[in-house]
A protein has these predicted regions:
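C-terminal alpha-helical "lid/dimerization" subdomain adjacent to the S-adenosyl-L-methionine
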Residues: 4-9, 17, 21-26, 30, ...
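Conserved alpha-helix/loop element of class I SAM-dependent methyltransferases that forms part
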Residues: 31-50, 65
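A generic alpha-to-beta junction signature in SAM-dependent methyltransferases
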Residues: 44-46, 69-70, 96, 143
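Glycine-centered, small-residue-biased loops immediately flanking beta-strands
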Residues: 50, 73, 147
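Class I SAM-dependent methyltransferase SAM/SAH-binding core
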Residues: 53-109
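A short acidic, Gly/Pro-enriched loop at the edge of an enzyme's catalytic core
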Residues: 108-119
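A short SAM/SAH-binding and catalytic strip from SAM-dependent methyltransferases
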Residues: 119-131
Length: 206
């Protein structure tokens, strides 16, 4: 049974940030996930006019990076957490509702038209998608034919990941093979995985 101590309560904000500790977590995400995001983004040949969706946009730092990578495109962010949406909107205030559009929503029911995006990103968030197969099918639905889906994760070993999954409700750590299989089932045809220790970047094309 999971201990209800203070640290575990704070860590619940990694999946759906709320309140003061949620905002602290979001600030930390913007800082400490930067190197992971940059390494992942280097695996994609970004085009200036792409429309890109970042799922689980958190504190909004990756939206700002995508705005720079696609200077003539539109960047969208979605997050289950109202706190995250508010934080990300403030972080990207300069471009908000011009080239940057951020809203609250669930990955299992994305509020976008079929084939709307050239690329979709997911940084440190797939752990919390439930049911994950439904979520991946939704990603495939809103991605254009030939579009790119980038997943970047710091954890890819379920056994080592127990230090987190035993503390954070609903968190699941997947192996690269598990994610690749689920991506194939969701309709992705070309999948490449880059792994360095436990960090993985999966680039999947529809």
């Amino acid at each position: 049974m999971r201990k209800k101590n203070f640290l575990n309560k704070v860590l619940q904000n990694t999946s759906c940030p709320q309140g003061f500790w949620g905002r602290m977590i979001l600030r930390g995400m913007n800082c400490f996930h930067a190197s992971l995001a940059n390494r992942g983004m280097k695996q994609v040949e970004w085009q200036p006019n792409w429309n890109v969706l970042d799922i689980g946009c958190g504190g909004g730092a990756n939206l700002k990076r995508l705005l720079n990578l696609c200077p003539k495109g539109n960047i969208y962010g979605i997050d289950l957490s109202e706190e995250s949406v508010s934080f990300a909107q403030k972080y990207n205030e300069k471009d908000l509702n011009k080239r940057c559009f951020i809203q609250q929503g669930n990955v299992c029911s994305l509020p976008y038209e079929d084939g709307f995006f050239n690329a979709i990103t997911a940084f440190e968030t797939v752990y919390f998608w439930s049911p994950v197969d439904k979520a991946l099918s939704e990603v495939a639905r809103v991605l254009r034919k030939g579009g790119c889906f980038l997943i970047s994760l710091e954890a890819s070993d379920p056994e080592l990941g127990k230090m987190w999954t035993e503390r954070i409700d609903g968190m699941v750590v997947y192996t690269p093979a598990e994610l690749e299989e689920r991506l194939h089932e969701a309709g992705f045809s070309s999948i490449r995985t880059i792994r360095k220790k436990e960090e993985i970047h999966i680039i999947a094309y529809k």
